[in-house]
Amino acid sequence: MVAFTIEQIRDLMDKVANVRNMSVIAHVDHGKSTLTDSLVQRAGIISAGKAGEARFMDTRKDEQERGITIKSTAISLYASMDDDDVKEIKQKTDGNSFLINLIDSPGHVDFSSEVTAALRVTDGALVVVDTVEGVCVQTETVLRQALGERIKPVLVVNKVDRALLELQVSKEDLYQTFARTVESVNVIISTYVDPALGDAQVYPDKGTVAFGSGLHGWAFTVRQFALRYSKKFGVDRAKMMERLWGDSFFNPKTKKWTNKDKDADGKPLERAFNMFVLDPIFRLFAAIMNFKKDEIPTLLEKLEINLKNEEKELEGKALLKVVMRKFLPAADALLEMIVLHLPSPVTAQAYRAETLYEGPSDDEFCTAIRNCDPKADLMLYVSKMVPTSDKGRFYAFGRVFAGTVKAGQKIRIQGPNYTPGKKEDLFLKSIQRTVLMMGRNTEAIDDCPAGNIVGLVGVDQFLLKSGTITTNEAAHNMKVMKFSVSPVVEVAVEVKNANDLPKLVEGLKRLSKSDPCVKTYMSESGEHIVAGTGELHLEICLSDLQNDHAGIPLRISDPVVAYRETIQAESSMVALSKSPNKHNRIYVKAQPIDEEVSLDIENGIINPRDDFKARARILADKHGWDVAEARKIWCFGPDGNGPNLVVDQTKAVQYLNEIKDSVVAAFQWATKEGPIFGENVRSVRVNILDVTLHADAIHRGGGQIIPTMRRVTYASMLLAEPAIQEPVFLVEIQCPENAIGGIYSVLNKKRGQVVSEEQRPGTPLFTVKAYLPVNESFGFSGDLRQATGGQAFPQLVFDHWAVLSGDVTDPTSKPGIIAKAKRERQGLKPEVPGYEEYYDKL
């Protein structure tokens, strides 16, 4: 039990080589918070009896009630290692005390934006996987996010007690299950890994995989067993480690190692991992769970486990817990992995600097980040806001990448749209206090050097969700985080009592601060809209809004899905519009963009800020565009970065460049609110074929060109088989065989399509993957539990946009009904307009 003081932690912060910033990531319900407990308990914050049940990191009331993690929480732990262990660390260290900043993150798909925020400020990740369920959809999503941020993973195979007690597997089966899990994690890692990370795969024989049970509080790595045996038999530990995993067998008769599973007489040999590692565990389990009172003491003596008198009275699971905790304490295995194999900020920032910093990679700030230099100018990234106990105020939670942050220091707060040399999105303020985040509490500290995680007081009014804090005006921003989910479900909120309106507006501001992925805006009809990533996320946001941020009763509409407008063919004829003064004409045609190009734009592979030559190269090589056309992309829309393009295909038009700005502005407007029902437009390319302009500049100003360009964009889209795209979830359901029928019937009712169904080897569970339209997903998990008697648990994650079949202009078709309902809600004419409304005859 290490009782440590804040001063000790503060001293360790200066030895950056001994700091480890890591987050715990996994699929929902694989036991992240439970595992974190054993680490927190080791640091002496909760009692050993509580560990595994306390879920110390679930700080909110609704987290405790639902038993899920919603927000990521941070805590600092202190660990000291033996000198032998420290020698094995492959990087520079200083002494044998270590400071571990640990962030427990949510596993639920709806909150994966919280995970992104946690990953940005850490360098290593503890990936937790359930032995029985194996690698699931969310494991893959978070691992992909982590590797994209250049974060090094180590693996924990959790819930081993389930395999032993529920499934009663044999030793060889268990080894195969472990091997399969490790292999599937490595497949994901090798698919998404960044070459700068080097080999990021995990290997049990190198000590980067731990096996254990968070609930019972025990875990082990192959390295720990190798240590035991090397002391006992006097063999070299490194050799022993290699032999304890994979195809190596020990022949007790000849005392020789072989890699064949039979000896000379053809008798089967036992795998070394089973014999030396699993056997003692299996024996303990068997003796204790079958109440063999006489065998237990001899076993305990052999394994050098000493029980107190009152502990000897226990039996069954209670005894098992105590014994396993003494035999293989989880904290030892996890701390050893974290300290030995995860990088320190000094190591990590050397290869993460260019992915973190937006400016040139050779300027002084990037160099300071690369060297993790505490004496340079301050560079601090705020990744999220944490609400304080005092209503309406937030701690800014982030990491110092260079320099030192002090209380009272004068700083520049740069929002995500800031560019050096301009004044927008920039505040000059001073920091009131710096604090250390400790799970449910905070501790004040005077300053915090580079490489550490910190909370700041007094900057929350000037940042929306994330941003960069510096002390030098030449510094660029740190890169903005990319979220793997997008807000697709929205509701309108209104107050029950008109006097409360200002409170609602204030509450919405606070809500959008406290959650990295919620979107709040005001629609044209004056409604306040809150958009979230899914049903659960929205539910949590609204309960926060009602109880914390606004603190007033609200009326909440039914959830509505955000659609996109698109086209399915080229315009059937050239669309033409004339300006209000009849002196200018624009001729255009619309054509659909391939889904692959749209995805590349949305994922930032094709970027409006790239050099146009580089962009044309990608479009030509990867997507087969004509190079001349690809170079003439005028703009992306909406918001200057959406998946719609204006391409200039005109020949020798006079004054063309003068109207470019007006055309771009009009296109942003037209794609933000499409012609069908005022939703965002997606995958539309507008080709400008010809423009006739008035010779006199005053007759071709913005007031003439902007409305014309917008009308002609609408006309060209309505001439090109307009359609609606709806968002589609990928659903993954794990269930026993007898529940599959129920799943299919629910999916059929809700327009779902099953993509795959497979059995997990070695378990009775099936995994069903299906596509489910977001529109149909409300109440889906409730219906599913009813149909399967509560045995199926769905995971929904936004996957893609799919075109709704049917004619939009026909008011009886499915898209027609949706368009009509939306238009009525917005107070427009209920019919979708024909192209004649925007098309002008010559």
From Swiss-Prot:
Listed GO MF terms: GTP binding; GTPase activity; ribosome binding; translation elongation factor activity
Zinc found in the keyword field: no
Residues noted as binding GTP in the record, renumbered to the chain: 26-33, 158-161, 213-215
Catalytic activity: GTP + H2O = GDP + phosphate + H(+)
Localization per Swiss-Prot or TrEMBL: Cytoplasm
A Gene Ontology term for the protein's cellular component: cytosol
Family label: Belongs to the TRAFAC class translation factor GTPase superfamily. Classic translation factor GTPase family. EF-G/EF-2 subfamily.
Name this protein carries in UniProt: Elongation factor 2
Provenance organism: Meyerozyma guilliermondii (strain ATCC 6260 / CBS 566 / DSM 6381 / JCM 1539 / NBRC 10279 / NRRL Y-324)
